[in-house]
């Protein structure tokens, strides 16, 4: 069945199409138990189920980027891969301005992610999509340790991404960047929600508002399996 494009994503984002669940399940079989047909006869997952959301994003990373053993600790928010990939593509657009209008690729480009978190998602996607090197910093040693477990399972990522513990929460760059070190860009994208509960409430409001607008326009309401 034809897959329509998602609105709002960058033109280079490979997640422009709706999820191909058959392909995702083939590469990540554990996703199968979360995929159901909704009342509109479309495949989807329950986006209010944290385990389903995590497994979907694990499948996206495995299928599209060949990343294995990626996870976030229980109780932590799961970053949506398509949106995080978008962020990387827009950084590439900014870098392109200094590279003859073309997004630069390869390890000659080095980025610094302030607050890379447990998932290390931006360095991972930046390396997978454009081949950039990264340093990811965090003020949480638990976050650094978890990120390192992911990197250790993926040799290419481990080679190109390094994590650093920032001892002082008051400082961003101090005692983090080495004296002879240069970065092409730095980035910082703090979490949008402080807890899973806050994220769930925001998601519920989003679906409710979408349904109100769709009904007003005479369209089919949104089901929570496909918001």
What are these regions (language model features)?
Residues 1-78:
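N-terminal auxiliary segments of SAM/dcSAM-dependent transferases
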Residues 59-64, 82-110:
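Conserved alpha-helix/loop element of class I SAM-dependent methyltransferases that forms part
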Residues 76, 110-116, 163-165, 186-187:
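Extended hydrophobic secondary-structure segments that form protein cores and membrane-embedded regions
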Residues 104-117, 135:
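Conserved class I S-adenosyl-L-methionine
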Residues 118-132:
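Conserved SAM-binding loop of SAM-dependent methyltransferases across substrates and taxa
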Residues 133-139:
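Conserved SAM-binding motif I beta-strand of class I
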Residues 139-188:
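S-adenosyl-L-methionine
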Residues 188-227:
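Mobile active-site "lid"/loop adjacent to the S-adenosyl-L-methionine
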């Amino acid at each position: 069945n034809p897959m329509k494009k998602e609105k709002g994503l960058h033109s280079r984002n490979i997640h422009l199409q709706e999820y191909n669940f058959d392909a995702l399940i083939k590469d990540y079989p554990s996703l199968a138990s979360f995929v159901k047909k909704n009342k509109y006869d479309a495949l989807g997952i329950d986006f209010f189920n944290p385990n389903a959301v995590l497994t979907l994003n694990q499948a996206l990373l495995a299928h599209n980027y060949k990343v294995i053993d990626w996870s976030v600790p229980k109780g932590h928010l799961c970053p949506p891969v398509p949106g995080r990939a978008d962020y990387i593509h827009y950084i590439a657009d900014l870098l392109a301005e200094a590279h003859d209008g073309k997004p630069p690729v390869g390890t000659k480009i080095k980025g610094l992610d302030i607050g890379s978190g447990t998932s290390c998602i931006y360095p991972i996607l930046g390396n997978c999509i454009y081949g950039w090197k990264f340093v990811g910093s965090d003020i949480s040693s638990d976050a650094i340790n978890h990120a390192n477990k992911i990197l250790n399972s993926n040799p290419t990522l481990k080679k190109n991404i390094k994590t650093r513990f920032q001892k002082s929460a008051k400082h961003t760059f101090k005692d983090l960047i080495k004296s002879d070190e240069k970065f092409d860009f730095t980035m910082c994208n703090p979490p949008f929600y402080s807890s899973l509960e806050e994220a769930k409430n925001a998601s519920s409001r989003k679906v409710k508002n979408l349904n109100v607008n769709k009904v007003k326009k005479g369209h089919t309401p949104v089901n929570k399996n496909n918001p």
